[in-house]
């Protein structure tokens, strides 16, 4: 069988073109590459509080924030911090669209490698026994759930059942990362809401942190000089309202325009062109 030909990237972001902007790689790709994770003051504060919750065996914590503020990056960062650390057993669940507590219990147990049991009580007993064994080994079990607003109110009962497993300390720590809709989920299950020890919120970045985030990404990609004039940055910040994800999306389009114009630093007109391209998606969905 003939060997398939390797595809060659021929778009604008070749290594040669990026070098014209003093970049070794693309700084604004929409990926979860941990090298580009910028921890602002608020991200650090939230992460520190979650670390305390885990190490103090406090049980249940929530990190809430609107779309695009970096919840998933912080969640993955949290998982990576414990993944290779002795004494911890973390699992990361990227989407938890659970409808029932049985469904939630089975999926979370499966993330730890436990078999599926037909009856919910059998599933809970098996999982409790597993957690007790971890505790005997002085291993702290951690569940990190992203997009937790997709859980039904009833499915939160699985978490309450897990938190009822105790042997002097909580056998499992649960951190939910969610959009603001999580308030409605908990409002329909106040018993589990009462178990939340820490509720943290991630908000849009202030201008100084936003500028530092964009510069940090450029620095990681090889460029020490600012990519934007002050006015150009303020236009990016304004249209994105301080939210990291749209700032990164607009900045990626700015990069494309700079290469087309053979320019080295983004001025306001470059950003305005990028904003025009960015806003087309909203017009298309209107």
Which residues does each PLM region occupy?
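Conserved P-loop NTPase "ATPase switch" module shared by AAA+ and STAND
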Residues: 130-155
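Conserved NTP-binding/hydrolysis module of P-loop NTPases
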Residues: 23-28, 99-118
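AAA+/P-loop NTPase substrate/partner-engagement loops
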Residues: 83-107
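Conserved AAA+ ATPase "SRH/arginine-finger" region at the nucleotide-binding site
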Residues: 95, 185-186, 197-210
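Walker A/P-loop nucleotide-binding motif
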Residues: 56-77
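A short, basic N-terminal segment
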Residues: 1-58, 276, 280-286
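C-terminal alpha-helical "lid" subdomain
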Residues: 2-18, 80, 117, 171, ...
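Sensor-1/coupling segment of RecA-like P-loop NTPase cores
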Residues: 66, 73, 119-126, 150-152, ...
């Amino acid at each position: 069988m003939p060997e398939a030909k390797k595809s060659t990237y021929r778009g604008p972001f070749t290594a040669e073109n990026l070098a014209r902007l003093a970049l070794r790689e693309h700084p604004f790709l929409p990926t979860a590459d941990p090298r580009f994770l910028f921890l602002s003051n608020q991200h650090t504060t939230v992460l520190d509080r979650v670390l305390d919750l885990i190490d103090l065996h406090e049980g249940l914590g929530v990190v809430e924030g609107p779309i695009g503020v970096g919840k998933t990056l912080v969640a993955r960062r949290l998982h990576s911090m414990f993944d290779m650390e002795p004494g911890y057993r973390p699992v990361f669940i990227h989407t938890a669209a659970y409808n029932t507590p049985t469904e939630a219990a089975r999926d979370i147990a499966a993330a730890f490698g436990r078999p599926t049991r037909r009856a919910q009580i059998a599933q809970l007993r098996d999982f409790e026994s597993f957690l007790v064994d971890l505790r005997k080994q002085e291993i702290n079990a951690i569940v990190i759930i992203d997009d937790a607003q997709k859980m039904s109110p009833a499915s939160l009962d699985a978490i309450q059942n897990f938190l009822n497993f105790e042997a002097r300390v909580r056998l499992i720590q649960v951190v939910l990362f969610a959009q603001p809709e999580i308030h409605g989920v908990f409002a329909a299950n106040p018993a589990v809401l009462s178990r939340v020890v820490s509720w943290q919120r991630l908000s849009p970045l202030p201008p100084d942190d936003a500028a530092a985030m964009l510069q940090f990404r450029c620095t990681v990609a090889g460029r020490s000089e600012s990519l934007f004039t002050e006015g150009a940055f303020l236009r990016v910040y304004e249209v994105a309202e301080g939210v990291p994800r749209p700032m990164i999306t607009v900045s990626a389009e700015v990069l494309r325009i700079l290469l087309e114009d053979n320019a080295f630093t983004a001025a306001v007109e470059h950003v305005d062109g990028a904003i025009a391209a960015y806003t087309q998606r909203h017009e298309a969905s209107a």
